[in-house]
């Protein structure tokens, strides 16, 4: 199968969609990106890369970071983690307060904001004031790339404008499900969302999940096959907020989106994919990125179903 040709076909077919969607505007630093960007990268287990667009241009990974922090936490705590954050789809917007109150401060899953904040708290319990460095080092390790870092401007923009996330962490704290200082936890969370990566780096970073826990480039086991499968299943059922069912229906791959415009997806035992296009649909997922992945699975037949 000629993946490069398929990517070039997809790039042509999505052009008409550039009139739709809006870039994230809840923090100013995200609103300033060029809305008409599109890039897509595929990483194979043998190290081959296929791509269209500027696949080495970095963007803010935002909620894609939740996959890395959940991996770290699940690796350390195992099933104990589910006492703090559940593993069910939410059906509500990613920053919803309503369900959180109804369910006594236990977030539905680690991929909505409340769940990722609790996950960050569990990591602060382990790593204390070195938590962000540990997260960043883990991402560098699974990406085989030591150049990855966060963006100070986006981090400070999140700190100044992330009011809904402050509301979430205070509500969770009131239910006793935040064990550390809330300022330390929220700063860790905002910093992880401000990490900058390219489609090429992000596709590389997901190969260990596509390979059931082993990085196929280095042959290093990152986590057990069982835990890798759990994370992949959560990506399928919860990876796109309240549009997760729609993504599973149309794309049929485990994936995770971020409001920065990125989406990662994995084809088990084959490859990892990252697509970037900053215009979002109403659920906060990349509109063109979702369509590009739908076209990819249609053209290749590589859905998990």
Curated annotation (Swiss-Prot):
Keywords per UniProt: Hydrolase
Q: Where does substrate bind?
A: 63, 113, 158, 165, 189, 241, 259
Please tell me whether the keyword Disulfide bond is annotated for this protein. no
GO terms for MF:
glutaminase activity
* Entry-linked InterPro entries: Beta-lactam/transpept-like (IPR012338), Glutaminase (IPR015868)
Which family does the entry's similarity section mention? Belongs to the glutaminase family.
State the protein's name: Glutaminase
| Encoding gene (name) | glsA
């Amino acid at each position: 199968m000629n993946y490069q040709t398929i990517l070039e076909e997809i790039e042509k077919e999505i052009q008409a969609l550039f009139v739709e969607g809006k870039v994230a505007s809840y923090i100013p630093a995200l609103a300033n990106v060029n809305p008409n960007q599109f890039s897509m990268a595929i990483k194979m287990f043998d190290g081959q890369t296929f791509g269209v667009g500027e696949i080495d241009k970095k963007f803010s990974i935002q909620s894609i970071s939740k996959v890395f922090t959940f991996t770290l936490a699940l690796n350390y705590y195992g099933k104990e983690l589910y006492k703090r954050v559940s593993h069910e789809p939410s059906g509500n917007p990613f920053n919803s307060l309503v369900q959180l109150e109804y369910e006594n401060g236990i977030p539905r899953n680690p991929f909505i904001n409340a769940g990722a904040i609790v996950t960050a708290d569990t990591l602060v319990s382990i790593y204390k004031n070195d938590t962000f460095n540990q997260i960043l080092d883990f991402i560098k390790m699974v990406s085989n790339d030591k150049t990855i870092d966060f963006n100070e401007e986006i981090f400070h923009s999140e700190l100044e404008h992330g009011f809904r996330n402050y509301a979430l962490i205070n509500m969770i704290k009131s239910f006793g499900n935040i064990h550390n200082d809330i300022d330390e936890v929220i700063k860790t969370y905002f910093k992880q969302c401000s990490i900058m990566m390219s489609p090429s780096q992000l596709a590389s970073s997901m190969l260990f999940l596509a390979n059931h826990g082993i990085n196929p480039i280095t042959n290093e086991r990152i986590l057990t096959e069982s835990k890798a499968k759990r994370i992949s299943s959560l990506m399928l059922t919860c990876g796109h907020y309240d549009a997760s069912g729609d993504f599973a229906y149309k794309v049929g791959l485990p994936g995770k989106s971020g409001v920065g415009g990125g989406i990662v997806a994995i084809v088990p035992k084959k490859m990892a994919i990252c697509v970037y296009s900053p215009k979002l649909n109403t659920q906060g997922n990349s509109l063109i990125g979702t369509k590009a992945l739908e076209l990819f699975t249609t053209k290749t037949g590589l859905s998990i179903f």
